[in-house]
Amino acid sequence: ALPTYTPESPADATR
């Protein structure tokens, strides 16, 4: 499942 927040970097989604 993908989060609503989609950052440019996949690793940035950890925050």
Swiss-Prot record:
GO MF entries: transketolase activity
Cofactor(s) this protein requires: Mg(2+); Ca(2+); Mn(2+); Co(2+)
EC number from the UniProt entry: 2.2.1.1
Assigned keywords, A-Z: Calcium, Thiamine pyrophosphate, Transferase
Swiss-Prot/TrEMBL catalytic activity: D-sedoheptulose 7-phosphate + D-glyceraldehyde 3-phosphate = aldehydo-D-ribose 5-phosphate + D-xylulose 5-phosphate
Nucleotide-binding in keyword set: no
Cysteines paired by S-S bonds: none
Purpose: Catalyzes the transfer of a two-carbon ketol group from a ketose donor to an aldose acceptor, via a covalent intermediate with the cofactor thiamine pyrophosphate.
UniProt name for this protein: Transketolase
Organism field: Populus euphratica (Euphrates poplar)
Lineage: Eukaryota, Viridiplantae, Streptophyta, Embryophyta, Tracheophyta
